[in-house]
Amino acid sequence: MDSVEKGAATSVSNPRGRPSRGRPPKLQRNSRGGQGRGVEKPPHMAALILARGGSKGIPLKNIKHLAGVPLIGWVLRAALDSGVFQSIWVSTDHDEIENVAKQFGAQVHRRSSEASKDSSTSLDAIIEFLNYHNEVDIVGNIQATSPCLHPTDLQKVAEMIREEGYDSVFSVVRRHQFRWGEIQKGVREMTEPLNLNPAKRPRRQDWDGELYENGSFYFAKRHLIEMGYLQGGKMAYYEMRAEHSVDIDVDIDWPIAEQRVLRYGYFGKEKLKEIKLFVCNIDGCLTNGHIYVSGDQKEIISYDVKDAIGISLLKKSGIEVRLISERACSKQTLSSLKLDCKMEVNVPDKLAVVDEWRKEMGLCWKEVAYLGNEVSDEECLKKVGLSGVPADACAAAQKAVGYICKSSGGRGALREFAEHIFLLMEKVINSCQK
């Protein structure tokens, strides 16, 4: 279970390196409505994700795909599904980030060049946002680089502020790490332990550990932020589970975060169902979309052996695999691939055919996975339980999808999407066993 710890603090530290301005002030809380004005309007709580385009560690990391989803999409999904925010915003200076944010249902605040410098702090960007949005009373600054955030965490923090009267709440994680004093090079001094007695090293189970900021979020009321603080007043921390405390800063963090998010990430309100039917568009997914013609006018196509293995693995796991195409492909050519899959070609309405297959097998849409790449696949991608596209799919298909492969069509995308399905199905099985 998530645990929530609360405590007073005597100093302020900024999440992104702004120097402390001394002891945080004791704040007098007030309401905008005042007395004698009828029912007091509830304070406006806004989620704010800061996502400038000039990331130095990983270029455009905020929209780089993590486990098939733009990085910023993970926290936007959690914020939207938490149901505690009156508005959800992304503050950015970049057109591509703006487009992705809007696709996920967020509003966009175009950050000024002054607040987008390398030297600008999170606090600078938040204050600028508040200057343009007088309706906002509380800001939940959620870090885009924390993809394992869950709605329940945000719901509990909102309750701490709205119901328990805290001015600021920030996220922490418990760590069991021994710290030692740093020694300058060339100085002959011995290091000293900072949080342990080496003669009596405790076992992990005998030590409570220490709390560290994990950077997932910082909630604060407007009047506190306007005084130059994100942490202060009546202040509390919120302890997150260790498996949900993921922060991405440099390239080496990426593959580790990807495995963590697949295992512990939040995938939406609707529970995942076990996939029973996998449908793949032929041209541009199974194949690379190229058509070759032999001297005797026979059609020749190519595909990746890895994708054939992916189909075999899907079948072995009990998933029915079927192929579809809007083009009048040569069934003789396709049968020569020896994939042993039912297929339909020259299909003007793919959704109707997939719906017929689904009903034939007695399945709901959540039990169907679809890999497509064209405009003609868009409706199927929106309808199924799990949807994927190759890296080179058209823009319309990418917007409709849940997972974007790193591989291109005909070059391993099918195998990659199959492995993604296996990971998610493991998650379904584990949740059923709990």
UniProtKB/Swiss-Prot annotation:
Predominant place of localization: nucleus
Residues the record lists as N-acetylmethionine modifications: M1
Subcellular localization(s) per the UniProt record: Nucleus
Enzymatic reactions: an N-acylneuraminate + CTP = a CMP-N-acyl-beta-neuraminate + diphosphate
GO process annotations (BP): CMP-N-acetylneuraminate biosynthetic process; glycosylation; N-acetylneuraminate metabolic process
Active site: R201
Gene3D superfamilies from the UniProt entry: HAD superfamily/HAD-like, Spore Coat Polysaccharide Biosynthesis Protein SpsA, Chain A
A Pfam family of this chain: CTP_transf_3
CDD domains listed in its UniProt record: CMP-NeuAc_Synthase (cd02513)
Residue window of motif BC2 motif: 200-206
Enzyme class at the top of the EC tree: transferase
Pathway(s) per entry: Amino-sugar metabolism; N-acetylneuraminate metabolism
GO cellular component, one term: nucleus
Annotated segments matching region Disordered: 1-42
Domain of life: Eukaryota
Residues recorded with modification Omega-N-methylarginine: R37, R52
Keywords noted in UniProt: Acetylation, Methylation, Nucleotidyltransferase, Nucleus, Transferase
Residues noted as binding substrate in the record, renumbered to the chain: R52, N62, R111, S120, S122, Q143
EC number of this enzyme: 2.7.7.43
Molecular function terms, GO-annotated: keto-deoxynonulosonic acid (KDN) cytidylyltransferase activity; N-acylneuraminate cytidylyltransferase activity; N-glycolylneuraminic acid (Neu5Gc) cytidylyltransferase activity
Motif (BC3 motif): 269-276
Entry note about domains: The BC2 (basic cluster 2) motif is necessary and sufficient for the nuclear localization and contains the catalytic active site. The localization in the nucleus is however not required for the enzyme activity.
Family: Belongs to the CMP-NeuNAc synthase family.
Function: Catalyzes the activation of N-acetylneuraminic acid (NeuNAc) to cytidine 5'-monophosphate N-acetylneuraminic acid (CMP-NeuNAc), a substrate required for the addition of sialic acid. Has some activity toward NeuNAc, N-glycolylneuraminic acid (Neu5Gc) or 2-keto-3-deoxy-D-glycero-D-galacto-nononic acid (KDN).
Subunit structure: Homotetramer; the active enzyme is formed by a dimer of dimers.
Name of the protein described by the UniProt record: N-acylneuraminate cytidylyltransferase
